[in-house]
A protein has these predicted regions:
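Active-site loop/oxyanion-hole signature of alpha/beta-hydrolase fold enzymes
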Residues: 68-72, 78-80, 114-157, 324
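Catalytic histidine-centered segment of alpha/beta-hydrolase-like enzymes
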Residues: 311-323
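Acidic catalytic loop of the alpha/beta-hydrolase fold
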Residues: 283-288
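Alpha/beta-hydrolase fold catalytic core
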Residues: 1, 6-10, 17-86, 107-110, ...
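Short beta-strand/loop motif that positions the catalytic acidic residue
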Residues: 273, 279-281
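Conserved HGGG/HGGXW glycine-rich cap/lid loop of the alpha/beta-hydrolase fold
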Residues: 73-125
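Conserved alpha/beta-hydrolase catalytic His-Asp/Glu region
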Residues: 192-193, 211-272
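Flexible "cap/lid" loop of the alpha/beta hydrolase fold
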Residues: 171, 178-210
């Protein structure tokens, strides 16, 4: 603080704009004071304008949406909370909205980051000639994301295809992963569904997938997690279809589906996983039965195994129970 002609004024570093008291501002200053702002006074008189106000504070648990460049593609992600970093990786044809019911719970203990993988959600959808759309490419994008937001070591939670991406990252970048949560990951060949059968058709498969894959078939893929009287997942499915129903998105989804059909690299990577791991499964998962989860936990060297009374998406079907189990594992138990 400096004294000039018996009038006190802020030094430049003490005020947001570095301007001393100006007589013509007195009326405005009085209006601010009358409005209830706590302005500096000397001898009952105002002595500084503009007033210095404390910056507004924000609840860190309130999700914020940001963009970052990763492997040459723009990635949209949602961030909420403080604490140890936790990265949530969504399933095929999904996005960060799949975690909407658990982010408020998890952000009470963790700094949660939920990205849209390239080609999905609100992230950029580069052509397959520029982006590979396989588990390894997605995991490399997550490495870039972590570096861009200043994360040196994280816990990873991946659902279905996202679990496969998380598994790949833990196998190739073990130094980056603190703990691993695999939710119904695609590791062993699943029971074929309509979508994978279409994608595997020669010649006509790409045309059907990119041109004729409509809302009804899209919704049928998510039907198990829509049931149960919860309308929120149903609204999310419609939102996801709107994001999918564009040429670039369909091209990316088709390339990803083709890569997902071969799970042999994932199975081969299991012995390289040394990260403490929780394997979570939905008891009513028809595409990947619970026996797949038990086998994976066993082959990971005795990872913790948790079964939920739901279908393929515990985070959407039983979010409170899922968040509690994940929080307990990440803050306490070590898994394998």
């Amino acid at each position: 603080m400096a004294v000039t002609n018996n009038v006190l004024a802020w030094n430049r570093e003490d005020t947001p704009v570095g301007r001393p008291f100006r007589p013509e501002s007195l009326a405005a200053a009085r209006a601010e004071s009358d409005a209830g702002h706590d302005l500096p006074r000397v001898g009952g008189r105002l002595w500084c304008w503009p007033p210095v106000r404390m910056p507004e504070t924000r609840d860190s648990r309130q999700p914020m949406t940001r963009d970052v460049a990763a492997r040459g593609a723009r990635i949209r992600y949602v961030e909420a909370g403080d604490g140890p970093p936790l990265v949530l990786v969504h399933d095929y044809l999904s996005s960060h909205v799949a975690w909407d019911d658990v982010v408020p719970r998890l952000s009470e203990r963790f700094r949660v980051i939920a990205p849209d993988l390239p080609g999905f959600g609100e992230s950029e959808k580069p052509p397959p000639s520029r982006y590979r759309y396989d588990f390894e490419a997605f995991s490399e994008s997550l490495v870039d994301l972590c570096a861009a937001v200043g994360l040196v070591r994280v816990s990873l939670c991946g659902h279905a295809m996202g679990g496969s991406v998380a598994l790949t990252l833990a196998a190739t970048q073990a130094h980056l992963v603190d703990k691993l949560v695999l939710v119904n990951p695609l590791v062993y060949p699943p029971r074929p569904d309509t979508l994978s059968r279409i994608a595997g058709l020669p010649i006509v498969g790409p045309f059907i997938f990119k041109q004729l894959f409509g809302r009804a078939l899209f919704r049928s893929r998510f039907l198990p997690r829509v049931r149960g009287g919860n309308s929120a997942p149903a609204r999310r499915v419609d939102h996801l279809f709107e994001l999918f129903d564009a040429p670039a998105a369909r091209e990316a989804a088709y390339a990803t589906m083709r890569a997902m059909l071969d799970t042999r690299p994932l199975t081969a990577s299991i012995p390289r996983i040394t990260t403490p791991t929780l394997v979570a499964w939905g008891r009513a998962n028809r595409a990947c039965p619970v026996e797949h989860g038990r086998r994976l936990a066993r082959e990971l060297g005795g990872a913790r195994f948790e079964v939920f009374d739901c279908g393929p998406s515990p985070a959407e079907e039983c979010p409170a129970a899922f968040a509690a189990v994940v929080t307990a594992f990440l803050t306490g138990g070590t898994g394998n």
